[in-house]
């Protein structure tokens, strides 16, 4: 299993009239968490794209427990429970500044060849870096 936590502050433009983070902006926080998890392992989306691989989101599931509020620092905990293959499943737990769980989510992404636009295995470098977490 691989886990990583990133912190992001809710900006004014991400909130609605009530001062809560607008529900559609949570997906961007998930992306920040995924990107920083990969970066923590020495990988980037841009390096995968340079190798001809994209990672589009296929599915997203969210459960809003409490609102994220303007100017709050949110901890985004990202969890990979199993070794990725053609698909990669991320789980997210968002915590407010009081360390209260405020949001649960999951995304399913697929590795896609930019040349064929068909699903494919991740690059070997990705597999090599992920394998130790799932042995």
Segments predicted by a language model, with ranges:
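Terminal targeting signals and extreme-terminal segments of soluble enzymes
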Residues: 1-75, 83-135
